Amino acid sequence: MDTKKEIKNNNFICQIINKDLNENKNLSFYTRFPPEPNGYLHIGHAKSICLNFELASLYKGRCNLRFDDTNPLKENIKYIKSIKHDINWLGYKWHGNVRYASEYFLKLYQYAQELIKKGLAYVDHLTKEQIREYRGTLNTPGKNSPYRNRTIQENIELFEKMKKGDFSEGEACLRAKINMSSSSIIMRDPVLYRIIFIKHHQTQNKWCIYPMYDFAHCLSDSIEGITHSLCTLEFQDNKFLYNWILKNTSVKHYPKQYEFSRLNLEFSILSKRKIKILIDKNIIEGWDDPRIPTLSALRRKGYTPSSIKNFCQKIGVTKQNNLIEFSMLEHCIRKELNQTAIRTMAILDPIKIFLYNLDSNYKEEFIVPNHPNNPEMGTHKIIFTNTIYIDRSDFKEKYDKKYKRLKLGEKIRLRYSYIIHAEKIEKDEYGNISNIICYCDLNTLGRKPKDNKNPAVIHWISEKNTLSAEFKLYDQLFNIKNPEQQENFLLYINSKSLIKKFGFIEKKIGEEIQKKISNNNIEIFFQFERIGYFCIDFIDSKKNQLVFNRTVGLRDTWDSKKIKTKNITNN
């Protein structure tokens, strides 16, 4: 089967591209990813990144990275650096140099002058509030500004005064002269330029007038020779203005805009404004808090580039907005880590076991696999002594027939080791179990017990093979599926979205991590047996205190039968 041919035939965007390329044999596919440098990328941006760069690869075309930096009030160099890092982390390389809309400010200014000279733009002195009031509603037409019918010469002179800084912020703006009764509100004389007196991160203090996004975006696409301008559905109405500007300026190239559905993820918020509220209220730690779906947060949580790209492939590209199951995202990373993560044992909530029939100097070594199905991943050594730790949840004092782990008077097998029998417990002054006294059957290594009944298996670590560690158990930040739709989304915060545990990992494994702790670009993943998949948190870890973030649990709750595996360019 020709996979590329199948991909090209199954996606509405690919069908459009195929048609365009077939009708114009000299056409080369050229697209772009155009973020505004006013925040950090999230999983929704990843869908757009994957789509644009994968299509460029599929059609042997090009994909630019262009920062639409037309609002210096909200932009920052740190966002530019972060966005570039995230794209590279996902494994993509843009064509040529990084581009900025600000590189085209002079050309955009000249296009604005063109519109004025054609009688299609005018300088307005209405305030922002008045412009909103004059615009009308979906049910009522707008009304003309009293400044709408100025002469062309007057508008040329006023626009030049705007450029020179003769007006204060909000005192004047340039508006397109289209139709204040248009059924599309965006076509009711939209603002094209506004005055902002602030230093720009690229052009410094050269300009004090800045083009609006809608004006700069389509013209930047044209200047760069973009053939297919792909954006999400919220820009569908903007297409009218996109095409109007191109039609009424002397551009030599006409890109085409196409829309696809944005990515909406269960139990998540993608809005920058709302995430900032969560940060300001100390509900989350920052933009890389593993409970939110920014790319930096997902990376810190242990998600890999390939798992995110696989997720984007599975959800595909359609024109229908829907809410994507979070369990599908978890499925993608779990499937990968099941193949690649080193197996080791960790105790998150330790309780001590004393094996009374073993001497204090008793020591035995076991060689265990780093992965049960991949011998090439090697092995590591664990030691067995008369004092070990198990997880508190693996012991029950009172008899419970349904409980299959260690119980008083019952037996259990230790992973890779012997069967032990719980005979007595010791408690501290608060009534908590501090020690379990057990008998170790040394005849059961790799063998069944005398009664021929194999008990359940639990994990453990020898007291002499421990290194203390902190474990962060992350869960959904919200307890409803679609918090974005709630007016007061803060009412639905999951109070148990982060639980911290303090326990132990295998000493040798921990010491190897400590050697690498200064290099926070190294990604190390583990399956803590019977617990879940974890990664080292290089931000919070110190040499004397390792911190692990739970990436995902062991149990897969996503029903893969609900959706066929789809390439990023599939429906």
Curated annotation (Swiss-Prot):
PROSITE patterns: AA_TRNA_LIGASE_I (PS00178). GO terms for biological process: glutaminyl-tRNA aminoacylation; glutamyl-tRNA aminoacylation. A motif ('KMSKS' region) lies at residues 269-273. SUPFAM superfamilies: Nucleotidylyl transferase, Ribosomal protein L25-like. InterPro entries: aa-tRNA-synth_I_CS, Gln-tRNA-synth, Gln/Glu-tRNA_Ligase, Gln_tRNA_ligase_bac, Glu/Gln-tRNA-synth, Glu/Gln-tRNA-synth_Ib_cat-dom, Glu/Gln-tRNA-synth_Ib_codon-bd, Glu_tRNA_lig_a-bdl. Its main location: cytoplasm. NCBIfam families: glnS (TIGR00440), PRK14703.1 (NF011291). Belongs to the class-I aminoacyl-tRNA synthetase family. Monomer. This is Glutamine--tRNA ligase. It comes from Buchnera aphidicola subsp. Acyrthosiphon pisum (strain Tuc7).
